[in-house]
Amino acid sequence: WHNEEEVLPLFLKEIEKIYEVMHVKHNVEMEYLFVDDGSTDRTLMFLREQEAENPRVNYLSFSRNFGKEAAMFAGLEKASGDYVVIIDADLQDPPELIIEMYETLQTTDYDCVASRRVSRKGESKIRSFFARMFYKGLRKISKVNIMYGARDFRMMTRQMTDAVLSLREYNRFSKGIFAWVGFN
């Protein structure tokens, strides 16, 4: 994340609620691994404070902004759990879906439960048009079926996470990689 100091306390509060449910309902332990993508605000200071106070909080910090793909990859490399969740801290994705994602992975043969955007409300028509054309064009030139509206918010098994990490591309397009690695 980059310059998320204002939303991080709210995000952490929401994730703590998820932990309480997961711990009580499923006896699950969780680690929260934050990746600070070179923030210039107080994000890093907040993460340091939280790591000192909360044993579930860990973080990585980049010296400058390397971009979302690099931050996601670094987080996947550092994550050690049997299941790994990718979620942005801006609360645009509902953290409570983490519980449903976990329950789905526990009761199916899937290796990944991912979210997708079903509405582009609030976006300009031109942005929506280009987003549709991007996914349509990508599906035409690629053998990988990337779902329209695919988001990075997902939960993956360790096996799928390791498969994603085995692809060492420098210029990553994670949504494509998630679809290509061959897991359900």
Regions found by a protein language model. Name each.
Residues 4-7, 39, 94:
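Donor nucleotide-sugar binding loop of glycosyltransferases
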Residues 49, 56, 60-64, 68-78, ...:
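Acceptor/aglycone-binding surface of glycosyltransferases and processive sugar-polymer synthases
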Residues 31, 56-58, 184:
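Conserved beta-strand segments of alpha/beta enzyme cores
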Residues 12, 23-38, 60-61:
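Short beta-strand/loop segment that forms part of the nucleotide-sugar
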Residues 4-23:
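Short, well-formed alpha-helical segments that are part of the catalytic scaffolds
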Residues 10, 14, 42, 46-49, ...:
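Alpha-helical transmission elements in cytosolic ATPase-linked domains
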